[in-house]
Amino acid sequence: ELKELLAKMFSDLYSQTMMMLRSCEIDYENPPDISKSVVAVNGVPLGTQDNLFCITGGEGTGKSNYVGAILAGALGEKRLPIEKTLGLEITANPKGLAVLHYDTEQSEAQLHKNLGKTLRRASLTAVPEFCHSLYLASLSRKDRLKLIRESMDLFHHRHGGIHLVVIDGIADLIRSA
């Protein structure tokens, strides 16, 4: 009886936590949908729609060029040949879902130049309306985080979903980095 009473008391006390727990618990009888690959190499997924994919490297090692190849692949209705995406298999974006590119490091002029390279790689002459490349170097860390959070929500609703989000320079968003 005491055990039941305590269980009820804690259940009432932590009702909000209990609701969150239920939503987080794995239901083995109802498996989740399989994650869809967005970035792969030789058929092996590196980045999926519901996970993070991180590219690291020293200054001047070509990270922005690599990011440009990923973005180029995400801009078209059909998959680009791997020669244009540096050997990566990038899932095409036939529905025109949002492709968001936030850069915290490059100057506005450099980001403009990089975007031009991305468009040429994708064989495009103009930025698709669902693609948003945003230069955040001039903003404070707090403002960058707010802008990213709110714009992702805005663009998700505007374009019917998000295909890809790239944050180039994510370390600049971390207080202790």
Where on the chain are the PLM-derived regions?
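Long, basic/Gly/Ser/Thr-rich N-terminal segments
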Residues: E1-K8
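Conserved inter-motif catalytic segment of the P-loop NTP-binding fold
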Residues: I82-K84, I90-A177
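The Walker A/P-loop phosphate-binding site
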Residues: F10-T118
